[in-house]
From Swiss-Prot:
Organism: Anabaena variabilis
Name listed for the protein in its UniProt record: sn-1 stearoyl-lipid 9-desaturase
Motif Histidine box-1 positions after renumbering to this chain: 60-65
Protein role: Desaturase involved in fatty acid biosynthesis. Introduces a double bond at carbon 9 of stearoyl groups (18:0) attached to the sn-1 position of the glycerol moiety of membrane glycerolipids. Does not desaturate palmitic acid (16:0), palmitoleic acid (16:1) and cis-vaccenic acid (18:1).
Subcellular location: Membrane
């Protein structure tokens, strides 16, 4: 792998040790004494809440791209769910993703896939990124919101509070599966959108980058694997544009529409 940057990137040791600690914690899930079906159930439920409702629906389609609107209380709830995925605070996440779309697969892209699969999957997170300084410029719509500021500042403590709740409800096995294993699982599912869907699959549209549609990533990440479609129509709340491109998050948006909780839903114009 070659990282095409003008200067050698510096390792972010805080991030590196943080990710290492979480992965070590996740391995404790494979110790038989930490296994229970209840703990696995908690992990699966939180996988959907934090990865599906939080990251995919909340952070990504609602806040980053504003592909639909919800009442403010629901937006805050979805952003809280995304914050519990422990992928940084919402302001940083949204800003970084907007930068990615502006510079997709070019050197300023934080996870430029031309720098290799490893880099776009996790490498970019363990090095200091110059794009971090641009986040304020890309998040003016949310940066002054006190709820977003609170979640950005205290996302680690919010995760700790969830861990303590799980410890109270089900003991150490709930913490291992519901926090450590679940966080790492959702990490890699999310990261596959940055790596696998810029390498594997098919391209329906010329989006000006290497984005692809990858069915198995779509399964893991609630429809986010139809990434070439998304890059072609970034504003669209629906990513799976063909009948066989199952998009669970789009189905969720449709349900919210029926309930009167999603309005101004934007859809792709495939004639473009």
């Amino acid at each position: 792998m070659t990282i095409a940057t003008s200067t050698k990137p510096q390792i972010n040791w805080v991030n590196t040790l943080f990710f290492l600690g979480l992965h070590i914690g996740a391995l404790f899930a494979f110790i038989p004494s930490n296994f229970s079906w209840a703990a696995v159930g908690v992990a699966l439920l939180l996988y959907w809440i934090t990865g599906g409702l939080g990251i995919t629906l909340g952070f990504h389609r609602l806040v980053t791209h504003r592909s639909f609107q919800t009442p403010k209380w629901l937006e805050y709830f979805l952003v809280l769910c995304g914050t519990l995925a422990c992928q940084g605070g919402p302001i940083e996440w949204v800003g970084t993703h907007r930068i990615h779309h502006l510079h997709s697969d070019t050197d300023p892209d934080p996870h430029d896939s031309n720098k290799g699969f490893w880099w776009s999957h996790i490498g970019w997170l363990i090095y200091h990124s110059p794009s971090h300084a641009d986040v304020p410029r890309f998040t003016k719509d949310i940066a002054e919101d006190p709820v977003y500021q609170f979640l950005q500042k205290y996302f680690i403590f919010i995760q700790i509070a969830l861990g303590l709740l799980l410890l109270y409800l089900g003991g150490w096995s709930f913490v291992v599966w519901g926090v450590f294993f679940r966080i790492v699982w959702v990490y890699h599912c999310t990261w596959l959108v940055n790596s696998a869907t810029h390498k594997f699959g098919y391209r329906t549209y010329d989006a000006g980058d290497r984005s692809t549609n990858c069915w198995w990533v779509a399964v893991l990440v609630f429809g986010e694997g139809w990434h070439n479609n998304h890059h072609a129509f970034q504003y669209s709340a629906r990513h799976g544009l063909e009948w066989w491109e199952v998009d669970l998050t789009w189905m969720t948006v449709q349900l919210l529409q029926i309930l009167g909780l999603a309005t101004n839903v934007k859809l792709a114009d495939k004639k473009q």
